[in-house]
Amino acid sequence: MAPDVDLDAVAASTPGMVGADLANLVNEAALLAARRGHDQVGTADFADALEKIVLGSVRGIMLSREERERTAYHESGHALLGMLTPGADPVRKVSIIPRGRALGVTFQAPDTDRYGYSEQYLRGRIVGALGGRAAEEIVYSDVTTGAESDLDQVTSIARQMVGRWGMSDAVGPIAVLPPPGQESPLGLDGVAPATRELVDLEVRRIVDECHDEALATLTAHREQLDRLAHALLAKETLDEDEAYAAAEVPRDEAPGVLARGDVPGILPDPGAPPRADAVVAGS
């Protein structure tokens, strides 16, 4: 391992990862170093390996000018709300390089591991996930299919808030829905139709409120949205410092940045147990 590798920095960038995840990271970094002809695994190898694991492999496709610009605004919407929403995880990287199934990605991760969930945090997750769609609405007065995975995440979080975590006054502090992935295929789970309808109404209310918040925040900070999108178009990928600088949001003063020890929770992927404390939004 090269002397420039800061293991504390590596640990800080991998909250929630278990031993197998870290072993995979080290192996991937070693493979990258070997391909590059390096005798030692360096900081850049670790950074690129983490990016590949978390964000996915780069896809060799060429976007049109219009699609590239729209993707930049979509990701800037996610990122700017991550910076401005109280309690949100810090934005670590924003990119408009196509990876996996996404045309762009915004990566957020907390400074420490998280194991609990607060309603404020979960609402912030929904607001941030709706940021890409909201940015498209503001800039283009139209939306695309790029928000598909965002809407899946939004719906899952809101349904669990209402049906499992007691975060709806109308439904009350009871768990009326089964855990994700354990639903009865015939709907024979003992939940009355009227209760299901109430859950649906509350889910829609929460999502609508968060959507309104996303639109209002991005509209109020339109100049910052434009600056961030233009920086993305110029560089394609922005790291944490570059993203906050482009948006002119002081990193240490951003309302989305929590002090250490003041972390309310991390939501796992829909249907999966908690693993890595990271939020990835893509278009």
PLM region spans:
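Short hydrophobic/aromatic residue motifs in ordered secondary structure
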Residues: D21, G77-H78
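Soluble catalytic regions of large protease machineries
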Residues: R70-Y73, A79-S283
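Single-residue recognition of alpha-helix capping/boundary positions
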Residues: V5-D6, D21, D45, E67, ...
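A generic alpha-helix surface/boundary motif
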Residues: D4-D8, N27, E75, D226, ...
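Conserved C-terminal "switch" segment of AAA+ ATPases
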Residues: M1-A47, K52, G56, I61-M62, ...
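Short pre-active-site segment immediately N-terminal to the catalytic Zn-binding motif
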Residues: I61-T71
